[in-house]
Amino acid sequence: MTDIEKQTEIREKKGRNVMRELKIQKLCLNICVGESGDRLTRAAKVLEQLTGQTPVFSKARYTVRTFGIRRNEKIAVHCTVRGPKAEEILEKGLKVKEYELYKENFSDTGNFGFGVQEHIDLGIKYDPGIGIYGMDFYVVLNRNGVRVSKRRRAPGRIGPSHRVDKEETIKWFQQKYDGIILPPKPKTKKNVYRRR
C-alpha cells in the first residue's frame, strides 16, 4: 500500500463519523384487543412466540361505556425488543409491507411505525387455538451520545444538529432497506351537512 492509498483510506474513515450514524434504539410491538380475558392472553402468546420475551399488559386509562371498557382493565399487550433481535423482527415486518411506507408513518422526532394485519405473515405458524391477530410496530431511532440527556447524574442537552428528524429517518430507511416512500393517501371527504 502506498502513502497516497493510506491517506485516502484514512480520509474515508474520518468522513464516516460513527457518532452521526443512526441506529435502532428499540422496537415496540403492540396488540390492542380492546377487552380483557381469553383473547388478551392469546394475544400475549403470539407476542411471546414472536419475541421470546414475556409481554406486558396495558390497562385502560378511563372508562368508555360505548366500547365496554372499564378503567384499569387490561385491554392490550405490548413488548419492547432491542438489539439484533429487534432488527430481525423489523425486517420481517417490513417484508410483509413490501418495504413500502407512507411519509405519514414517520414522526418529526425521527421515529416511525406501521401496522400488520395478520401475525401469521411474520412467519409464525397458524394455531387454530390462538386465532389471527394484527399488531403495531413502533421503531425508535437515535444516535450515539443520547445518554447525555437521559443519565441521572449531570444530565446535558442534545443540540439540534445531533437530534434525529423526519428527513434523516426517511433517508436512513431508503438506504438501509431500499425502502419506498409512497405518495400521501387520498383524503376522504367526511359528510358535510349544510344548514338550510
Swiss-Prot record:
Compartment(s) where it occurs, according to its Swiss-Prot or TrEMBL record: Nucleus; Cytoplasm
One GO CC term of this entry?
Answer: nucleus
Q: Which Pfam families match?
A: Ribosomal_L5, Ribosomal_L5_C
Q: Which GO terms describe its biological process?
A: translation
**Effect of a null allele:** RNAi-mediated knockdown results in sterility and a germ cell proliferation defect.
Q: Iron: present as a keyword of the record?
A: no
Matching entries from InterPro entries are given as: Ribosomal_uL5, Ribosomal_uL5_C, Ribosomal_uL5_CS, Ribosomal_uL5_dom_sf, Ribosomal_uL5_N
- Respond yes or no to whether keyword tRNA processing is given for this record: no
Molecular function per GO: RNA binding; rRNA binding; structural constituent of ribosome
Q: Which UniProt keywords apply?
A: Cytoplasm, Nucleus, Ribonucleoprotein, Ribosomal protein, RNA-binding, rRNA-binding
Job of this protein: Component of the ribosome, a large ribonucleoprotein complex responsible for the synthesis of proteins in the cell. The small ribosomal subunit (SSU) binds messenger RNAs (mRNAs) and translates the encoded message by selecting cognate aminoacyl-transfer RNA (tRNA) molecules. The large subunit (LSU) contains the ribosomal catalytic site termed the peptidyl transferase center (PTC), which catalyzes the formation of peptide bonds, thereby polymerizing the amino acids delivered by tRNAs into a polypeptide chain.
As a miscellaneous remark, the entry gives: There's a functional difference between the two L11-encoding proteins in C.briggsae. rpl-11.1 plays a role in the germline whereas rpl-11.2 has a somatic function.
Give the family from UniProt: Belongs to the universal ribosomal protein uL5 family.
Q: How does it assemble?
A: Component of the large ribosomal subunit.
> What name does the UniProt record give this protein?
Large ribosomal subunit protein uL5A
Q: Which organism is it from?
A: Caenorhabditis briggsae
Q: Report the gene name.
A: rpl-11.1
